Protein backbone atom coordinates (compact mmCIF):
# COMPACT_ATOMS: atom_id res chain seq x y z
CA UNK A 1 0.00 0.00 0.00
CA UNK A 2 2.04 2.96 1.26
CA UNK A 3 5.32 1.34 0.21
CA UNK A 4 6.28 3.87 -2.45
CA UNK A 5 6.08 6.77 -0.03
CA UNK A 6 9.30 5.14 1.07
CA UNK A 7 10.92 6.38 -2.10
CA UNK A 8 9.67 9.91 -1.63
CA UNK A 9 11.17 9.94 1.85
CA UNK A 10 14.38 8.51 0.45
CA UNK A 11 14.57 11.34 -2.07
CA UNK A 12 13.96 14.06 0.49
CA UNK A 13 16.43 12.71 3.06
CA UNK A 14 19.11 11.93 0.52
CA UNK A 15 18.77 15.27 -1.27
CA UNK A 16 19.05 17.08 2.03
CA UNK A 17 22.09 15.03 2.98
CA UNK A 18 23.75 16.03 -0.26
CA UNK A 19 23.94 19.59 0.99
CA UNK A 20 24.74 18.96 4.64
CA UNK A 21 27.42 16.30 4.38
CA UNK A 22 29.73 17.77 1.76
CA UNK A 23 32.83 16.83 3.68
CA UNK A 24 31.65 13.23 3.90
CA UNK A 25 31.10 13.01 0.17
CA UNK A 26 34.43 14.65 -0.61
CA UNK A 27 36.26 12.23 1.66
CA UNK A 28 35.83 9.53 -0.96
CA UNK A 29 36.02 11.10 -4.41
CA UNK A 30 35.75 7.67 -5.99
CA UNK A 31 32.03 7.82 -5.16
CA UNK A 32 31.58 10.36 -7.96
CA UNK A 33 32.96 7.95 -10.52
CA UNK A 34 29.91 5.74 -10.15
CA UNK A 35 27.68 5.97 -13.19
CA UNK A 36 23.90 6.07 -13.00
CA UNK A 37 21.94 3.29 -14.67
CA UNK A 38 20.60 4.62 -17.99
CA UNK A 39 17.10 3.34 -17.17
CA UNK A 40 16.76 6.18 -14.65
CA UNK A 41 15.79 8.52 -17.47
CA UNK A 42 13.90 6.12 -19.74
CA UNK A 43 10.17 5.64 -20.11
CA UNK A 44 8.62 2.18 -19.72
CA UNK A 45 8.91 1.15 -23.37
CA UNK A 46 12.51 2.34 -23.54
CA UNK A 47 13.43 0.25 -20.49
CA UNK A 48 11.86 -2.82 -22.07
CA UNK A 49 13.65 -2.33 -25.39
CA UNK A 50 16.93 -1.46 -23.67
CA UNK A 51 17.02 -5.01 -22.32
CA UNK A 52 16.32 -6.52 -25.73
CA UNK A 53 12.59 -7.24 -25.44
CA UNK A 54 9.81 -6.17 -27.81
CA UNK A 55 7.53 -3.46 -26.45
CA UNK A 56 4.08 -2.10 -27.20
CA UNK A 57 2.08 0.62 -25.49
CA UNK A 58 -1.62 1.41 -25.49
CA UNK A 59 -4.08 3.90 -24.06
CA UNK A 60 -7.12 2.43 -22.35
CA UNK A 61 -10.15 4.60 -21.60
CA UNK A 62 -12.22 3.79 -18.52
CA UNK A 63 -15.99 4.06 -18.23
CA UNK A 64 -15.59 7.32 -16.28
CA UNK A 65 -13.23 8.85 -18.83
CA UNK A 66 -9.70 8.32 -17.51
CA UNK A 67 -7.07 7.37 -20.09
CA UNK A 68 -4.57 4.85 -18.76
CA UNK A 69 -1.15 3.95 -20.12
CA UNK A 70 -0.76 0.19 -20.53
CA UNK A 71 2.49 -1.47 -21.58
CA UNK A 72 3.08 -4.86 -23.17
CA UNK A 73 5.98 -7.28 -23.52
CA UNK A 74 4.53 -9.61 -26.19
CA UNK A 75 7.44 -12.06 -26.33
CA UNK A 76 10.66 -13.07 -24.65
CA UNK A 77 14.08 -11.69 -25.51
CA UNK A 78 15.07 -14.61 -27.72
CA UNK A 79 11.61 -15.81 -28.70
CA UNK A 80 10.46 -16.09 -32.29
CA UNK A 81 6.94 -17.00 -31.18
CA UNK A 82 4.64 -14.14 -32.10
CA UNK A 83 1.46 -16.20 -31.83
CA UNK A 84 -1.14 -16.17 -29.09
CA UNK A 85 0.11 -16.79 -25.58
CA UNK A 86 -1.48 -16.85 -22.13
CA UNK A 87 -1.83 -13.31 -20.79
CA UNK A 88 -0.41 -12.19 -17.44
CA UNK A 89 -1.42 -8.76 -16.15
CA UNK A 90 0.79 -7.02 -13.57
CA UNK A 91 -0.55 -4.22 -11.36
CA UNK A 92 1.78 -2.05 -9.29
CA UNK A 93 1.62 -0.73 -5.72
CA UNK A 94 0.63 2.64 -4.25
CA UNK A 95 2.62 5.49 -5.83
CA UNK A 96 4.18 3.03 -8.23
CA UNK A 97 4.04 2.42 -11.97
CA UNK A 98 4.74 -0.27 -14.54
CA UNK A 99 8.52 0.06 -14.09
CA UNK A 100 8.21 -1.79 -10.78
CA UNK A 101 8.10 -5.06 -12.68
CA UNK A 102 11.18 -4.33 -14.84
CA UNK A 103 13.44 -2.27 -12.53
CA UNK A 104 16.00 -5.00 -11.90
CA UNK A 105 18.01 -6.94 -14.47
CA UNK A 106 16.00 -9.39 -16.59
CA UNK A 107 16.90 -12.40 -14.43
CA UNK A 108 15.48 -10.62 -11.36
CA UNK A 109 12.44 -8.80 -12.82
CA UNK A 110 9.08 -10.59 -12.91
CA UNK A 111 7.94 -8.87 -16.10
CA UNK A 112 10.95 -10.09 -18.07
CA UNK A 113 10.94 -13.56 -16.50
CA UNK A 114 7.31 -14.11 -17.46
CA UNK A 115 7.99 -12.98 -21.04
CA UNK A 116 10.94 -15.38 -21.30
CA UNK A 117 8.74 -18.16 -19.90
CA UNK A 118 6.38 -17.78 -22.85
CA UNK A 119 3.71 -15.43 -21.50
CA UNK A 120 2.17 -12.31 -23.01
CA UNK A 121 2.94 -9.72 -20.32
CA UNK A 122 0.84 -6.59 -19.79
CA UNK A 123 1.55 -3.94 -17.15
CA UNK A 124 -1.07 -1.49 -15.93
CA UNK A 125 -0.83 2.03 -14.53
CA UNK A 126 -3.34 3.44 -12.06
CA UNK A 127 -5.13 6.68 -12.85
CA UNK A 128 -3.19 9.72 -11.73
CA UNK A 129 0.31 8.27 -12.00
CA UNK A 130 3.05 9.32 -14.42
CA UNK A 131 1.61 7.38 -17.37
CA UNK A 132 -2.11 7.93 -16.67
CA UNK A 133 -2.60 11.69 -16.45
CA UNK A 134 -5.20 12.06 -19.21
CA UNK A 135 -9.00 12.21 -19.26
CA UNK A 136 -11.59 12.62 -21.99
CA UNK A 137 -12.92 15.92 -20.61
CA UNK A 138 -10.83 16.84 -17.54
CA UNK A 139 -7.19 17.81 -17.05
CA UNK A 140 -4.87 17.47 -14.04
CA UNK A 141 -5.13 21.17 -13.21
CA UNK A 142 -8.78 20.66 -12.27
CA UNK A 143 -9.85 19.45 -8.84
CA UNK A 144 -12.48 17.20 -10.43
CA UNK A 145 -9.75 15.16 -12.14
CA UNK A 146 -8.40 14.05 -8.74
CA UNK A 147 -11.65 12.94 -7.11
CA UNK A 148 -10.77 9.26 -6.93
CA UNK A 149 -9.16 6.66 -4.71
CA UNK A 150 -8.34 2.97 -5.02
CA UNK A 151 -12.12 2.41 -5.01
CA UNK A 152 -12.40 3.83 -8.52
CA UNK A 153 -9.19 2.09 -9.55
CA UNK A 154 -10.77 -1.25 -8.64
CA UNK A 155 -14.19 -0.49 -10.09
CA UNK A 156 -13.09 1.24 -13.30
CA UNK A 157 -9.36 0.92 -14.07
CA UNK A 158 -8.87 -2.82 -13.59
CA UNK A 159 -12.01 -3.89 -15.53
CA UNK A 160 -11.21 -1.51 -18.40
CA UNK A 161 -7.63 -2.76 -18.67
CA UNK A 162 -8.48 -6.45 -18.44
CA UNK A 163 -11.33 -6.32 -20.96
CA UNK A 164 -9.19 -4.26 -23.34
CA UNK A 165 -6.39 -6.81 -23.11
CA UNK A 166 -8.70 -9.77 -23.67
CA UNK A 167 -10.27 -8.07 -26.69
CA UNK A 168 -6.86 -7.16 -28.11
CA UNK A 169 -5.33 -10.60 -27.67
CA UNK A 170 -8.38 -12.74 -28.31
CA UNK A 171 -7.80 -14.54 -25.02
CA UNK A 172 -10.84 -15.53 -22.97
CA UNK A 173 -9.09 -15.10 -19.65
CA UNK A 174 -6.02 -13.65 -17.94
CA UNK A 175 -3.74 -14.21 -14.97
CA UNK A 176 -3.57 -11.31 -12.51
CA UNK A 177 -0.53 -10.46 -10.38
CA UNK A 178 -0.76 -7.53 -7.99
CA UNK A 179 1.56 -6.04 -5.39
CA UNK A 180 0.25 -4.08 -2.40
CA UNK A 181 -2.36 -1.63 -3.75
CA UNK A 182 -2.38 -3.74 -6.91
CA UNK A 183 -3.93 -6.50 -4.78
CA UNK A 184 -6.34 -4.04 -3.17
CA UNK A 185 -7.74 -3.01 -6.54
CA UNK A 186 -7.90 -6.66 -7.58
CA UNK A 187 -9.97 -7.59 -4.54
CA UNK A 188 -12.34 -4.70 -5.27
CA UNK A 189 -12.70 -5.49 -8.98
CA UNK A 190 -13.26 -9.22 -8.53
CA UNK A 191 -15.71 -8.85 -5.64
CA UNK A 192 -17.68 -6.14 -7.47
CA UNK A 193 -17.85 -7.87 -10.86
CA UNK A 194 -18.31 -11.67 -10.58
CA UNK A 195 -18.34 -12.02 -14.37
CA UNK A 196 -14.90 -10.42 -14.57
CA UNK A 197 -13.63 -12.63 -11.75
CA UNK A 198 -14.65 -15.71 -13.75
CA UNK A 199 -12.27 -14.62 -16.51
CA UNK A 200 -9.29 -14.40 -14.16
CA UNK A 201 -7.67 -17.84 -14.09
CA UNK A 202 -5.55 -17.05 -11.06
CA UNK A 203 -4.95 -14.09 -8.74
CA UNK A 204 -1.42 -13.80 -7.33
CA UNK A 205 -1.39 -11.41 -4.37
CA UNK A 206 2.06 -10.16 -3.30
CA UNK A 207 2.10 -8.40 0.06
CA UNK A 208 -1.68 -7.85 -0.09
CA UNK A 209 -3.25 -5.01 1.88
CA UNK A 210 -6.93 -4.60 2.70
CA UNK A 211 -6.78 -3.18 6.22
CA UNK A 212 -3.70 -1.82 7.95
CA UNK A 213 -4.31 -0.94 11.62
CA UNK A 214 -1.19 -2.93 12.58
CA UNK A 215 1.16 -1.35 10.03
CA UNK A 216 4.38 -0.41 11.82
CA UNK A 217 6.09 1.83 9.28
CA UNK A 218 7.25 5.17 10.68
CA UNK A 219 5.64 6.67 7.61
CA UNK A 220 2.24 5.57 8.91
CA UNK A 221 2.93 7.30 12.21
CA UNK A 222 3.97 10.48 10.43
CA UNK A 223 0.65 10.59 8.57
CA UNK A 224 -1.35 9.60 11.65
CA UNK A 225 -2.87 13.06 11.97
CA UNK A 226 -6.45 14.30 11.64
CA UNK A 227 -7.87 14.07 8.13
CA UNK A 228 -8.49 17.81 8.05
CA UNK A 229 -4.80 18.45 8.69
CA UNK A 230 -3.79 16.06 5.91
CA UNK A 231 -6.04 17.95 3.51
CA UNK A 232 -4.64 21.26 4.67
CA UNK A 233 -1.07 20.08 4.03
CA UNK A 234 -1.65 18.12 0.81
CA UNK A 235 -4.46 20.08 -0.80
CA UNK A 236 -7.24 18.49 -2.85
CA UNK A 237 -5.64 17.47 -6.15
CA UNK A 238 -2.63 15.27 -6.87
CA UNK A 239 0.38 14.52 -4.69
CA UNK A 240 3.68 12.63 -4.55
CA UNK A 241 4.57 12.97 -8.23
CA UNK A 242 8.12 13.08 -9.57
CA UNK A 243 9.74 16.51 -9.25
CA UNK A 244 11.58 17.05 -12.52
CA UNK A 245 14.47 19.21 -11.36
CA UNK A 246 15.20 16.84 -8.43
CA UNK A 247 15.44 13.71 -10.55
CA UNK A 248 19.04 14.30 -11.61
CA UNK A 249 20.44 15.12 -8.15
CA UNK A 250 18.44 12.38 -6.43
CA UNK A 251 19.43 9.60 -8.83
CA UNK A 252 23.07 10.71 -8.67
CA UNK A 253 23.00 10.81 -4.89
CA UNK A 254 21.43 7.34 -4.67
CA UNK A 255 24.12 6.14 -7.07
CA UNK A 256 26.88 7.52 -4.86
CA UNK A 257 25.19 6.64 -1.56
CA UNK A 258 23.31 3.56 -2.70
CA UNK A 259 23.48 1.75 0.63
CA UNK A 260 22.23 4.81 2.49
CA UNK A 261 19.21 5.03 0.21
CA UNK A 262 18.69 1.29 0.60
CA UNK A 263 18.71 1.58 4.38
CA UNK A 264 16.10 4.34 4.19
CA UNK A 265 13.84 2.11 2.09
CA UNK A 266 14.17 -0.81 4.48
CA UNK A 267 13.73 1.35 7.57
CA UNK A 268 10.35 2.47 6.30
CA UNK A 269 9.14 -0.63 4.41
CA UNK A 270 10.84 -3.42 6.36
CA UNK A 271 13.27 -6.09 5.24
CA UNK A 272 17.05 -6.08 5.00
CA UNK A 273 19.19 -3.97 2.68
CA UNK A 274 21.29 -7.07 1.98
CA UNK A 275 18.37 -8.40 -0.06
CA UNK A 276 18.24 -5.31 -2.30
CA UNK A 277 20.44 -4.81 -5.33
CA UNK A 278 21.72 -1.43 -4.17
CA UNK A 279 23.31 -0.81 -7.57
CA UNK A 280 19.74 -0.49 -8.92
CA UNK A 281 18.35 1.93 -6.34
CA UNK A 282 18.95 4.92 -8.61
CA UNK A 283 16.59 3.24 -11.07
CA UNK A 284 13.95 2.76 -8.38
CA UNK A 285 14.00 6.41 -7.30
CA UNK A 286 14.27 7.56 -10.91
CA UNK A 287 10.68 6.47 -11.49
CA UNK A 288 9.10 6.72 -8.05
CA UNK A 289 7.05 8.13 -6.55
CA UNK A 290 4.80 8.18 -9.61
CA UNK A 291 1.98 10.09 -7.93
CA UNK A 292 -1.64 9.66 -6.95
CA UNK A 293 -4.59 11.71 -5.71
CA UNK A 294 -4.88 13.22 -2.26
CA UNK A 295 -8.22 11.44 -1.99
CA UNK A 296 -6.43 8.12 -2.44
CA UNK A 297 -3.98 9.02 0.32
CA UNK A 298 -6.93 9.95 2.55
CA UNK A 299 -8.64 6.62 1.78
CA UNK A 300 -5.55 4.73 2.94
CA UNK A 301 -5.40 6.98 5.99
CA UNK A 302 -8.98 5.95 6.77
CA UNK A 303 -8.10 2.25 6.56
CA UNK A 304 -5.40 2.62 9.20
CA UNK A 305 -8.26 3.37 11.60
CA UNK A 306 -10.96 1.11 10.15
CA UNK A 307 -11.68 -2.42 11.30
CA UNK A 308 -12.87 -3.54 7.88
CA UNK A 309 -11.99 -3.26 4.19
CA UNK A 310 -14.39 -0.52 3.10
CA UNK A 311 -15.13 2.13 0.51
CA UNK A 312 -14.16 5.78 0.87
CA UNK A 313 -15.77 7.56 3.81
CA UNK A 314 -17.25 10.90 2.69
CA UNK A 315 -18.93 11.55 6.04
CA UNK A 316 -22.41 10.41 7.05
CA UNK A 317 -24.31 13.00 4.99
CA UNK A 318 -22.44 12.39 1.73
CA UNK A 319 -22.32 8.64 2.40
CA UNK A 320 -26.14 8.61 2.43
CA UNK A 321 -26.17 10.30 -0.98
CA UNK A 322 -23.55 8.02 -2.50
CA UNK A 323 -24.12 4.68 -0.73
CA UNK A 324 -27.64 5.08 0.67
CA UNK A 325 -26.23 4.40 4.13
CA UNK A 326 -24.42 6.53 6.69
CA UNK A 327 -21.24 4.43 6.72
CA UNK A 328 -19.08 3.19 3.82
CA UNK A 329 -19.98 -0.30 2.56
CA UNK A 330 -17.49 -3.10 3.10
CA UNK A 331 -15.98 -4.96 0.15
CA UNK A 332 -17.14 -8.59 0.07
CA UNK A 333 -13.89 -10.47 -0.48
CA UNK A 334 -15.61 -13.75 0.40
CA UNK A 335 -17.56 -13.55 -2.87
CA UNK A 336 -14.42 -14.01 -4.96
CA UNK A 337 -14.13 -17.57 -6.27
CA UNK A 338 -10.97 -16.97 -8.31
CA UNK A 339 -8.06 -19.29 -7.37
CA UNK A 340 -5.84 -17.06 -5.25
CA UNK A 341 -2.19 -17.42 -4.22
CA UNK A 342 -0.73 -15.19 -1.51
CA UNK A 343 2.82 -14.30 -0.52
CA UNK A 344 3.53 -12.41 2.72
CA UNK A 345 6.52 -11.09 4.63
CA UNK A 346 7.30 -11.28 8.34
CA UNK A 347 9.03 -7.89 8.38
CA UNK A 348 6.53 -6.18 6.10
CA UNK A 349 5.78 -2.83 7.75
CA UNK A 350 2.71 -2.20 5.60
CA UNK A 351 1.13 -5.65 5.16
CA UNK A 352 1.68 -6.64 8.78
CA UNK A 353 1.34 -10.35 9.68
CA UNK A 354 -1.49 -9.47 12.10
CA UNK A 355 -3.48 -7.86 9.32
CA UNK A 356 -2.59 -10.76 7.02
CA UNK A 357 -4.00 -13.19 9.57
CA UNK A 358 -7.30 -11.34 9.32
CA UNK A 359 -7.31 -11.35 5.51
CA UNK A 360 -6.38 -14.97 4.74
CA UNK A 361 -9.53 -16.62 6.21
CA UNK A 362 -11.66 -14.35 4.01
CA UNK A 363 -10.14 -15.68 0.78
CA UNK A 364 -12.61 -18.35 -0.30
CA UNK A 365 -10.41 -20.14 -2.84
CA UNK A 366 -6.92 -19.84 -1.35
CA UNK A 367 -4.82 -22.32 -3.30
CA UNK A 368 -1.40 -21.33 -1.98
CA UNK A 369 0.19 -19.21 0.71
CA UNK A 370 3.89 -18.75 1.41
CA UNK A 371 5.30 -16.60 4.18
CA UNK A 372 8.86 -15.28 4.15
CA UNK A 373 9.78 -14.29 7.73
CA UNK A 374 12.64 -11.96 6.71
CA UNK A 375 10.90 -10.15 3.86
CA UNK A 376 9.74 -6.54 3.89
CA UNK A 377 7.28 -4.83 1.57
CA UNK A 378 9.77 -4.17 -1.23
CA UNK A 379 11.22 -7.67 -1.43
CA UNK A 380 8.24 -8.82 -3.50
CA UNK A 381 9.30 -6.62 -6.42
CA UNK A 382 13.00 -5.90 -5.83
CA UNK A 383 14.33 -8.66 -3.58
CA UNK A 384 17.55 -10.31 -4.75
CA UNK A 385 16.15 -13.72 -3.84
CA UNK A 386 12.67 -13.05 -5.26
CA UNK A 387 13.34 -15.02 -8.46
CA UNK A 388 14.37 -18.18 -6.68
CA UNK A 389 11.91 -17.98 -3.82
CA UNK A 390 8.78 -16.53 -5.44
CA UNK A 391 8.87 -15.71 -9.17
CA UNK A 392 9.65 -19.28 -10.18
CA UNK A 393 6.75 -20.46 -8.02
CA UNK A 394 4.41 -17.95 -9.64
CA UNK A 395 5.35 -19.28 -13.07
CA UNK A 396 4.92 -22.84 -11.82
CA UNK A 397 1.43 -22.09 -10.47
CA UNK A 398 0.37 -20.23 -13.60
CA UNK A 399 1.51 -23.18 -15.70
CA UNK A 400 -0.44 -25.54 -13.44
CA UNK A 401 -3.63 -23.50 -13.79
CA UNK A 402 -3.30 -23.03 -17.55
Q: How would you name each of these model-derived features?
A:
Residues 144-168:
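Alpha/beta-hydrolase active-site loop
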Residues 92-94, 174-183, 345:
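Conserved alpha/beta-hydrolase "nucleophile elbow" surrounding the catalytic nucleophile
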Residues 62, 67, 71-138:
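Short, surface-exposed "cap/lid" segments of acyl-processing enzymes
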Residues 338, 352-361:
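Short alpha-helix in the alpha/beta-hydrolase fold that links the catalytic acid
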